[in-house]
Design a protein with these regions (language model features):
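Bacterial N-terminal signal peptides that target proteins for export
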Residues: 1-11
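Right-handed parallel beta-helix/beta-spiral solenoid domain characteristic of secreted/periplasmic
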Residues: 39, 47-53, 71-82, 88, ...
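Short glycine/acidic-rich loop motifs that flank beta-strands on beta-rich extracellular proteins
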Residues: 67-68, 85-91, 120-131, 152-158, ...
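Short, T/G/N/S-enriched strand-turn elements that build extracellular solenoid repeat scaffolds
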Residues: 55-71, 86-96, 265, 348-349
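Bacterial N-terminal signal peptides
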Residues: 10-20
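Acidic, glycine- and Ser/Thr-rich low-complexity intrinsically disordered tracts
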Residues: 315-316, 326, 367-369, 377-512
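Right-handed parallel beta-helix
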Residues: 102, 106, 139-150, 167-184, ...
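Right-handed parallel beta-helix/beta-solenoid
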Residues: 22-66
Length: 512
């Protein structure tokens, strides 16, 4: 009897040993297991051999795991092996018995093209999948090493819910690629702080990168008032950083409706309809856009006329609205557009080869012909300084390097080197339209969003005058905007390894 008992004990010990040795192998095949005291839990996704074959199922499992009290401090990671995943992933932080804060979703390879989220034929709860990954009210989300393409709305979308407890703070999007999504590539809305890093986007019906509707400390915040000055949107600003991005062949390279505290640095915006375009619109909360920094970017060759039949993508917008019965569109052929912005700093950028204007700034009128219902889109207190325009004459911008509509106040231009300035009708001196720095800051209600004297915002004798912003933006048909483009050099001189891309009109498509 004693001799028989030795064999089972030996076998049992061997099995325990083998089980211990096998644990890493199970993880490698997509198993999930957490050692006591572990600081991270990984949920692996792959087409064959993993526990999870879809990203959504792994995300759901991670959310359920994190929701358990004993796992609250454990980091959760969804690791996706190379492959094409035809699905739309939703990370819903409002769900009960799920917790997604701090979740990382990443491709296992540094080559972001190895993990493809495919929108064509992807299904969602209500039909076609709208987004590659959509995260709702999740703090600290990390998205890395993926490519999202062909979705009905957006590639990667993080936003706050609208239930009064909204939050989506501190996200990080890193080494992502987005292409051919109907609206946006990397899209953040209603968030406090975040990062978009080392990523690229092309062929979007709005913009490759978007940060919008930055929330303020109070939902009732406004920059209206004359005395005393209104307080800041955020007393302790939480900044969003966009760095080392490549945005090309989109309607807009960057769009930021009512965005605030955004830094865009060391990035390239080229071959878009327009390059960097922060803007103020009634369509979203917390107007206006402002308090942003755009520094050390290359902004060039933004001459993609996406209104033409030969364009590789279509604008998702039917226009920005109506002014005087005419449809307003974003101006094309422009490097940087400050639309209705306050306290933005445009500094040390390299702006060249844009066929209309290098850097344009203007208000959205809130009176007479109304473009902004609350008169929130006033161009005030912006600084445009130390920019290099036209590559020293080798690749000039088109009509002018700088164009300003003479509205608002407190704006200034300085140390931009040799440059050209749109003069208007000559009734207002250039020194008043483009005053030097510094200037005394103004309050929004001390200045007007309408100017009829300088002939830059509107020409009442010819409302279609393309030298004015309203005449140019209401060109009809819109592809006729290019009728007033000025191509000062042909072809563009080489710049690094970039290649200029434009759309050739078909016979009769542009009527100048």
């Amino acid at each position: 009897m004693k001799q028989r008992s030795v064999v089972p004990a030996f076998v049992l010990g061997l099995l325990v040993l083998l089980g211990t040795l096998a644990t890493p192998g199970l993880a490698a095949k997509g198993g999930q297991g957490k050692k006591p005291g572990a600081k991270a839990m990984t949920f692996e996704v792959c087409k064959h051999g993993c526990r999870y074959r879809t990203i959504q199922k792994a995300v759901d499992a991670a959310g359920s795991f994190k929701a358990k009290k004993r796992n609250a401090k454990v980091k959760t990671v969804v690791a996706i092996r190379p492959g094409k995943y035809v699905e739309g992933v939703v990370v819903d932080g409002t769900l009960r018995k799920k917790r997604f804060d701090g979740l990382t979703i990443k491709g296992t390879k540094k080559n972001r093209k190895k993990v493809v989220l495919e929108g064509r034929n992807a299904k969602g709860e209500l039909g076609a999948a709208q987004n590659g990954i959509e995260a709702i009210s999740v703090d600290g989300l990390v998205l890395e090493n993926m490519w999202a393409r062909n979705y009905q709305s957006n590639g990667f979308f993080v936003h706050a819910a609208t239930d009064g407890t909204q939050h989506c703070d501190g996200y990080r999007m890193d080494n992502l690629l987005a292409s051919a999504n109907r609206s946006y590539g990397l899209f953040a809305k209603g968030c406090l702080g975040g990062k978009m890093l080392d990523s690229a986007g092309f062929h979007h019906g709005d913009s490759a990168f978007y940060v919008g509707e930055t929330p303020c400390d109070r939902k009732t915040w406004t920059n209206h008032g004359t005395a005393p000055p209104p307080g800041p949107c955020q007393r302790k600003p939480q900044w969003t950083l966009l760095k080392n991005l490549r945005s090309y062949e989109n309607v807009l390279g960057y769009s930021g409706t009512n965005s605030k505290y955004v830094k865009i640095v060391e990035s390239a915006f080229y071959n878009n309809g327009a390059g960097i375009v922060p803007n103020t619109l009634d369509s979203e909360g917390f107007e206006p856009n402002g308090w942003n920094l755009f520094e050390r970017n290359d902004v060039f060759w933004n001459n993609y006329n996406y209104f033409l039949a030969g364009a590789k993508f279509r604008t998702v917008s039917g226009g920005l609205g109506q002014v005087g019965g005419a449809t307003v569109n974003y101006p094309t052929g422009v490097g940087i557009v400050l639309y209705g912005g306050a306290n933005n700093v445009v500094k040390r950028n390299n702006v060249f080869g844009n066929y209309k204007w290098g850097i344009a700034s203007f208000s959205g009128p809130g009176e007479i012909f109304v473009a902004n219902e609350g008169d929130d889109a006033k161009s005030i207190n912006n600084q445009i300084v130390e920019n290099a325009m036209g590559r020293g004459g080798a690749d000039p911008n088109g009509e002018y390097d700088f164009w300003n509509d003479a509205t608002g106040g407190g704006n200034c231009w300085a140390d931009n080197g040799p440059a050209s300035f749109a003069p208007g009708n000559g009734k207002v001196p250039l020194s008043e339209i483009y005053p030097g720095c510094p200037q005394t800051e103004v309050l929004a209600d001390q200045v007007r969003s309408l100017d009829i004297e300088a002939g830059l915002q509107i020409n009442f004798a010819d409302t279609a005058d393309p030298r004015t912003i309203l005449g140019y933006a209401t060109s009809n048909p819109p592809q006729n905007q290019e009728c007033s483009w000025v191509r000062r050099v042909a072809p563009h001189p080489a710049f690094e390894k970039f290649v200029p891309v434009e759309v050739a009109p078909q016979p009769g498509e542009v009527s100048c």
